[in-house]
Amino acid sequence: MSSTQIRTEIPVALLILCLCLVACHANCPTYRSHLGFWQEGWSGQVYQDWLGRMNCSYENMTALEAVSLNGTRLAAGSPSSEYPNVSVSVEDTSASGSGEDAIDESGSGEEERPVTSHVTFMTQSVQATTELTDALISAFSGSYSSGEPSRTTRIRVSPVAENGRNSGASNRVPFSATTTTTRGRDAHYNAEIRTHLYILWAVGLLLGLVLILYLCVPRCRRKKPYIV
């Protein structure tokens, strides 16, 4: 193998190695189930935080501009002008009586321990919608340490028409998510995943830098002896 072939094949091999690392990382089930992803929504991009483990499905994004789920925190974006109100249903599937007292956000002021709760946000304010949703979900979630069992919270978000009833296309649930929350265990997984990501990114940057230097830095060529 000539020196010219070696100089040509080394950058190609480095590039193939970088692509293989990226492909393995993207297809690894352990990472794929934790990291989340960028996904096109009704308008703009939806970022699902990779620190939360979830199983999400989008059927209809007509009423929400963006929906983001991070653990048990749900942040709803601006509703569309056609269906300005957002209906959120939260179901806590943990063992009965294991959670804290849930506060009814509908305005009755009564404290109860429901398994399923439903609330309609009559607002177009992103901040108000987010705060109300966080308050509702916090009533089910509480705070957990590493020794406590995991619990599952199912969250459904759907648009509501002006008259307060679902009609037409709004009958379809645009966002359905299931997330298992155990704070201590998740924190351990998150730290491990971040470490693996940092190592992978460092290796990728190093290989890319070597490739750039190899291709861009001029090489000193030895002069051939002059033969008379």
Swiss-Prot record:
Glycosylation sites: 55, 60, 70, 85
Localization per record: Host membrane
Major localisation: host cell
UniProt signal peptide: 1-26
GO cellular component: host cell membrane; membrane
Keyword Glycoprotein: yes
Topological category with respect to the lipid bilayer: Single-pass type I membrane protein
Keywords: Glycoprotein, Host membrane, Membrane, Signal, Transmembrane, Transmembrane helix
Top-rank taxon, per record: Viruses
TM region positions: 197-217
Region (Disordered) location: 77-113
Compositionally biased region (Polar residues): 78-97
Protein's UniProt name: Protein K8.1
Lineage start: Viruses, Duplodnaviria, Heunggongvirae, Peploviricota, Herviviricetes
